Amino acid sequence: MGKDQELLEAARTGNVALVEKLLSGRKGGILGGGSGPLPLSNLLSIWRGPNVNCTDSSGYTALHHAALNGHKDIVLKLLQFEASTNVADNKGYFPIHLAAWKGDVEIVKILIHHGPSHSRVNEQNNENETALHCAAQYGHSEVVAVLLEELTDPTIRNSKLETPLDLAALYGRLRVVKMIISAHPNLMSCNTRKHTPLHLAARNGHKAVVQVLLEAGMDVSCQTEKGSALHEAALFGKVDVVRVLLETGIDANIKDSLGRTVLDILKEHPSQKSLQIATLLQDYLEGVGRSVVLEEEHAQEDTAQETRLSSPAQSPSQKTKSETVTGELSKLLDEIKLCQEKDYSFEDLCHTISDHYLDNLSKISEEELGKNGSQSVRTSSTINLSPGEVEDEEEDPNSCGPTGLWEALTPCNGCRNLGFPMLAQESYPKKRNYPMEIVPSASLDTFPSENENFLCELVDTAVTKKPCSLEIARAPSPRTDNASEVAITAPGTGHHRNSSTGPTPDCSPPSPDTALKNIVKVIRPQPKQRTSIVSSLDFQRMNHNQEYFEISTSTGCTSFTSSPPVSPPTSSVETTEIKNEGAEHTDDLSQQEDDEPPKEYDAGQFAGLLHGSSPACEAPENPFHLYGKRNQGEDGQEEASLANSPLPFKQTPIENNPEPSVKKIKPKVVSRTIFHKRSHQLENHTIVGTRMSRGGSRNGDQWGVNPGGFVERACTLGRIRSLPKALIDMHLSKNVSKSDSDLIAYPSKDKARVNWSKSSTAERSSKDNSERTPSFTSEWEEIDKIMNSIDVGINSELEGMNGEATRPRCPVQTVGQWLESIGLPQYENHLTANGFDNVQFMGSNVMEDQDLLEIGILNSGHRQRILQAIQLLPKMRPIGHDGYHPTSVAEWLDSIELGDYTKAFLINGYTSMDLLKKIWELELINVLKISLIGHRKRILASLGDRLHEDPPQKPPRSITLREPSGNHTPPQLSPSLSQSTYTTGGSLDVPHIIMQGDARRRRNENYFDDIPRSKLERQMAQTGDWGEPSITLRPPNEATASTPVQYWQHHPEKLIFQSCDYKAFYLGSMLIKELRGTESTQDACAKMRANCQKSTEQMKKVPTIILSVSYKGVKFIDAANKNIIAEHEIRNISCAAQDPEDLSTFAYITKDLKSNHHYCHVFTAFDVNLAYEIILTLGQAFEVAYQLALQARKGGHSSTLPESFENKPSKPIPKPRVSIRKSVQIDPSEQKTLANLPWIVEPGQEAKRGINTKYETTIF
């Protein structure tokens, strides 16, 4: 160890000359050494020289010392002599961790790029921290920039569930915070219940960081267990941060998990700081109250000439109004929370709400009812979305209005996601926690006896729009008649005053598919509910900072429309109730509506409508057209949209009937769901729409594009005629069962151009258009001509700029939606888990029947149905088709949406498209470790046909497998693997392919030191599912003195709570008459390989199985049908080892408790590396089980022993087979529970062995 110690000391002190002298006897690396065989003298000097990867007592290698002390030249020299960058010290730190902690950007770059050994940027230490955590915590912005460029995952959480952004915010690293949120803005929404970056920054008083986070769009009202960020800042006395949060509009009434507000916390900690903060809060609340009063007085002056119904919530007296609103909200909130605590049904909750509104209406005085009895009541009640966010037309947008109601209705408190249900709400399936709009209709003097039921059914089912404020807004109808009418007005809008600008959404909205899916989950009411979904076509003065996406549903049609924020003038609207009878329709729907009163019906049909059904009743003579519409001037004035214009229907003349009978007026119902969305975000989204109809013989939707980037559907109002029932039924059969597969992707070529629509819709009328007055008809015909001319011009422009729009395109939908459209949603997990996760890349040249069988779809009828549906999907076009030639590997992978593999390709030497065109599927499996068959098939389909006439040739002699000992011997695979198992037309030589892949992958790198963890574990680490290990494992090299392996493959919790699954070929088992440890495994392996080599037919029968390894043992699972064949307990496994003749073959010995016989089970892995990992995982499973048993024994709780170790008999220690095996001293007291787990490395001395190191484990 003398030279090793000298090397370590020279690296620590920066003595370049001594390092070079000590390592000069070794062969030079890629920077200084030549190629070719080494003379004997050099080999001897290597034997006598120091080990470049030797470690000291703390686990530091020379590279650790050099990186920590900033010796750049030493780092370069060590890498030149093949030092490994992926050796961890005793605390799990890699050299890149130390360089990032020190802030040495040059050394970080060298470790990542220089080679031959390259650092893995996402490697974690024992605290689960990456190098990005170290750099972010200490504010090394240059290092952070380099790591972000190298695709370091910023979502990985350490053992305290902290991301790099959390650490930067906690320690006030402003520049780092800006860099991370600029590169990954989605991190601000990926928070835990323990903390958020905003809470951490507020707690430590980092005012600048708090401002940056809020400016970047972080929700100021986001909550954790400790409440809002205001709680944290107040508790720790950060006055400046409190001031910033209050100015941003945070709700001061938010409560923490203990039910305490900020003022409650201040009372518990009286101090000078608490007094200052309390004063700030008081001034803020008083200022908000004054601003609300001023705006209300201004609003009342504007409406002083209007006739309005009085209400306690709109009293001119400030004190009366404030007390009334506060009292009503308090009572309502208490009852809602009571309903939640007692787990009442949603119907009870809605009944509670409706009772309050009924009470409000009953308070209207008889005097004002007499004055306004001839006026129609327009009532729109909406519910506050989140504290501090009020868009009431009479309140300042930054004021703090009534709070707590929406939090009581939704499980995700404080998340401002305007118009979109949170994903967390799916855990509350019994409560429809989506926005509700309560729209009571008609004058009170018309049918006062029906108010209660009417309000109840409206509350129960009118789930159409997420409101943004709690208000009871009333406005008189501009009409002169007494017809009952209902209107939904956009939040913050009014008929007679300018609207206030409300806050824009802080969260990015989901895709249209996700939105539709969430809506469908909501609009599924309980059966036999009386339902009336009432809304209006009249949306006025919409906020100019937002876009509104509508879902307008009528009896059998759905439109999905994106419209710009417009301000059409007030127009009269007629709405009514409809009767839904599922798929049953009569010849005369209008007569049925006029003759029959409303009945109870199942509104489940609306769920189907939102999936894209087309009109099922009457259609206009001309199809609907899309036309572009832009804002006309900055004053917000806009002509009335045709989509918002009323449709005529027959009713009794109002002039002759002041109090019309409501039952005789049954106009149709149209409901709309409004989604708020940032205007600029739409430009970067994939646009959804319908196929364009070019031919004149087919009536379909057409596309319109305008410079403003907005598209809206409008009805071409021509003659409306009734359709025969047969045509209606045929139309229903074609469209009612349609799913979202009608949605087609049209990538926008210009950010200003947006195409958005849904399948074509049609409006119906109960009577013919001939009953219109002549002037009315002529006006609509004139408008019809104008719209047609606009439509023609727009479509001609679209044809010129988007010529390929008529090409068949792949529907923009998930695999689950596609499977649902063909009636097989149960196979979604089968497809996505195996790489068939994108319908754009699942054409007939990608997926085959054998693939479906392999992934576990055993029903032949279902496979045929899937294959038939796949024929309708577009085939993948190989590179070079249509002149497309990607210039880089990254560009090509991004084009097939497999960009995550970019780094794997580049690291393994696939740096050009020429190399990629020669890649084989075996290389994808063995070299690139692409285990998902769907991704492999996608890659091969994109690369085109394989050149079977040019198979890989014999590898050059320089290709070798590298071992820790430094010896070089060419790998030899078993004859069984070189047979026809993997052959293609008899021309594929498997050993040569694997060695060619190894040549590109390893070059001169250390082969066994750079084994990555499984993909599942990387995902678990990124999501923070693994926390602090519950047990402490000894490293393999400490568990046994004879192994060089320094770290395990998996997190201990993985083997305790889950399992590690590996695919392998099962060659068979052999009865062991005399148990001789690894000698028995060698004999069994040799016999099984000999059996497979006897005939090709025998080799074809070798089954593929899955070994599921955990601390309990090994489950033996059939890979075809996922059935568990057998389960071998850990206590019954006595030995596991690789075969020295073929390291890809391994075996383990189990004991049959019934017969008391031992059997050796033999497997062949896909490559040597996988076999090594399986054996190492088995060893870790033994270690985990052993440590669990020790914990149970030391704690004195025998009942806590794992099941596999209870009543475990002791076993004799077998005699070592090879003399160089180092004995392990074992405490006799520990032998009774579970013995030490030695890992044995036996340097091969026989020339017949392909690789001279094998990995074994033995249980005594």
From Swiss-Prot:
InterPro entries xrefs: ANKS1/Caskin, Ankyrin_rpt, Ankyrin_rpt-contain_sf, PH-like_dom_sf, PTB/PI_dom, SAM, SAM/pointed_sf, SAM_ANKS1_repeat1
Keyword Cytoplasm: yes
Biased composition (Polar residues): 306-326, 372-385
Highest taxon of the lineage: Eukaryota
ANK repeat feature ranges: 2-31, 58-87, 91-120, 127-156, 160-189, 193-222, 225-254
Residues bearing the modification Phosphoserine: S310, S311, S315, S354, S365, S508, S511, S739, S775, S974
Tissue spec: Isoform 3 is brain specific and highly enriched in the postsynaptic densities (PSDs), especially in cortical, striatal and hippocampal PSDs.
Primary residence: cytoplasm
Domain SAM span(s) in chain numbering: 810-876, 884-949
Subunit annotation: Interacts with EPHA8. Isoform 2 interacts with COIL. Isoform 3 interacts with DLG4.
Protein name: Ankyrin repeat and sterile alpha motif domain-containing protein 1B
Source organism: Rattus norvegicus (Rat)
Gene this chain is encoded by: Anks1b
